[in-house]
Swiss-Prot record:
Tree of life domain: Bacteria
Protein name: Small ribosomal subunit protein uS8
Stored PANTHER family: 40S RIBOSOMAL PROTEIN S15A
Organism, scientific name: Parvibaculum lavamentivorans (strain DS-1 / DSM 13023 / NCIMB 13966)
Protein family membership: Belongs to the universal ribosomal protein uS8 family.
Subunit record text: Part of the 30S ribosomal subunit. Contacts proteins S5 and S12.
Database matches in PROSITE patterns: RIBOSOMAL_S8 (PS00053)
Amino acid sequence: MTMTDPLGDMITRIRNAQLRGKGKVVTPASKLRGWVLDVLAEEGFIRGYARVEYPGGKSDFEIELKYNEGAPVIQMIERVSTPGRRVYSSVKTMPTVHNGLGISILSTPKGIMSDVAAREQNVGGEVLCRVF
């Protein structure tokens, strides 16, 4: 059976692993997931990630989660735009997450980026998720 929301699955895996205090989490690899993980790493929400290749062409991402004095750095991560309900935002209507302490990750014509980068480049797009 195919997965209908791969990005939502990755977000849920990250959330569950952080709630359990895990150091790493593994999720199937894809381009979209890699781009979202790039943004999370740039913004300092995760330590990093590595692509693990398996025989037969399958590959996974091994994500290193980040903690600050035992508390998870990601306090809240949620999917905004889902396959059944797409959410788009222009630069003017782009909401801030917790008064700028968090980020929104957007899919724009210029690639996957945070809301801060989208405002700098004056571009809107689909709001994939919010992280705080």
